[in-house]
Curated annotation (Swiss-Prot):
GO biological process: cysteinyl-tRNA aminoacylation
Cofactor mode of binding and number, as noted: Binds 1 zinc ion per subunit.
Organism: Helicobacter pylori (strain G27)
Keywords: Aminoacyl-tRNA synthetase, ATP-binding, Cytoplasm, Ligase, Metal-binding, Nucleotide-binding, Protein biosynthesis, Zinc
Name of the protein: Cysteine--tRNA ligase
EC number: 6.1.1.16
Amino acid sequence: MFIYDTKSKQKVPFEPLVEKKANIYVCGPTVYDDAHLGHARSAIAFDLLRRTLELSGYEVMLVRNFTDIDDKIINKAFKENKSIQELSSVYIESYTRDLNALNVKKPSLEPKASEYLDAMVRMIETLLEKNIAYRVSNGDIYLDTTKDKDYGSLSVHNSSMEFSRIGLVQEKRLEQDFVLWKSYKGDNDVGFDSPLGKGRPGWHIECSSMVFETLALANAPYQIDIHAGGADLLFPHHENEACQTRCAFGVELAKYWMHNGFVNINNEKMSKSLGNSFFIKDALKNYDGEILRNYLLGVHYRSVLNFNEEDLLVSKKRLDKIYRLKQRVSGTLGGINPNFKKEILECMQDDLNVSKALSVLESMLSSTNEKLDQNPKNKALKGEILANLKFIEELLGIGFKDPSAYFQLGVSESEKQEIENKIEERKRAKEQKDFLKADSIREELLNHKIALMDTPQGTIWEKLF
């Protein structure tokens, strides 16, 4: 297995801390709003990583957190006259629904920052004891980044650009020093009683503490195999996580860092500040979750994905081919084609080279359709095809529906009954040799984007996009 490590900026062999075990931490959402397509892409990218590792024989522990203590959450909660727990729980449920619709496997653990305050306080106390952290007059605690000679080694950031965005806080020693603990400021603030005084943790200390508390190993209590997230988290979030871990415990937080690329809308980075966020729940109103997943995984995870509906519909044709083949076969699951399994898995083991994997898939779909044309009753062939498709379902998370359900997506139960009635009416017309009426019914349904197909088993139908 080879992965691209952001820190070393090269593709490297994956050599976990414990043989054939992989522990992965993926930065999850700050739950103050609904999740957008950027969140979806990150979740799908590292779901593919997990699936690939599992099918390669690794035991995977994947943790994805919820940041439920944050300025944005506090501000919105006060505006809506809610507690931060009430507000965050709404968006945690929304995020979970969205990812279920995208067929993202449930993480091994989903910790909330609010559940690990004691661990955060202990880590800050360690940094204070080592004289690496300092307190300013308003009670806030910052980390002195000059104490970390490797600061900036992960992101190699443009400091003048990034720090001007962060802004200078009075009494900070340097602009890049970052907050570990925010003291309670009174009205319209949230604070927790602690040995550090009443207050709340900074964003970066939250994730580091959750990493150690959920993924600690006996031989590496402060290091994990892979820390992953969106490219927008590289600086300052991941840089600061790595920094405070080195300062507190003298080790690198992760052996490998992985980052997925941005999602652009009309060639512009999607962000709430630009007002061009595309929420997952809104996309799901127009497209089934499997169709969205298929589209979002079709571009290599490190590349920028420029979202547009034309490309989405083109990518849907790949799903159509999977289900067309699935429609042709039934029976008992057979043995997978070993060459197909080896070839497609090797593609994914090469830093999730999904483009190459999809090319292998397309080739398999074409060749097996040809074999079926020549041997339509070959049970062994059908069993092999079913096994191949089952492996695709496990590896890529697509192709898991019944074909009739897939081709009838977006049609209500009452509409289905109306269509079946029309099909029955057409059948009677054909029996009575009234082919003009039969053709008229077909055209009527086609005008409503319902296509009829006559097969030896009877007439079937599907919804056109």
